[in-house]
Amino acid sequence: MAVLTDEQVDAALPDLNGWERADGALRRSVKFSAFLDGIDAVRRVAEHAEAKDHHPDIDIRWRTVTFALVTHSEGGITDKDVQMARDIDGILG
């Protein structure tokens, strides 16, 4: 699978809710109303990621969860990451 160019990633961003290209990955931070709401969201995303065998890096800081997507085996952002970002958008609503 080919790594996307910066231009290709930038072209995909308008269709993604709150995602940005930063530090070589697609990133989205979400603030939840309560800590356990964030944990539940992480669980739902993790179940989907496991089924797809494509796992985001996840950082939990109290009520804020940050998802980062990069295809490590390819060394950059690929179509799999863009699709997973769309999937996460759907899971989080």
From Swiss-Prot:
Entry keyword set: Lyase
GO molecular function: 4-alpha-hydroxytetrahydrobiopterin dehydratase activity
Keyword Lyase attached: yes
Leading EC class: lyase
GO biological process: tetrahydrobiopterin biosynthetic process
EC number: 4.2.1.96
Gene3D superfamilies linked: Transcriptional coactivator/pterin dehydratase
Pfam families named among the record's database cross-references: Pterin_4a
Family under the similarity heading: Belongs to the pterin-4-alpha-carbinolamine dehydratase family.
PANTHER family: PTERIN-4-ALPHA-CARBINOLAMINE DEHYDRATASE
Protein name: Putative pterin-4-alpha-carbinolamine dehydratase
Organism: Mycolicibacterium vanbaalenii (strain DSM 7251 / JCM 13017 / BCRC 16820 / KCTC 9966 / NRRL B-24157 / PYR-1) (Mycobacterium vanbaalenii)
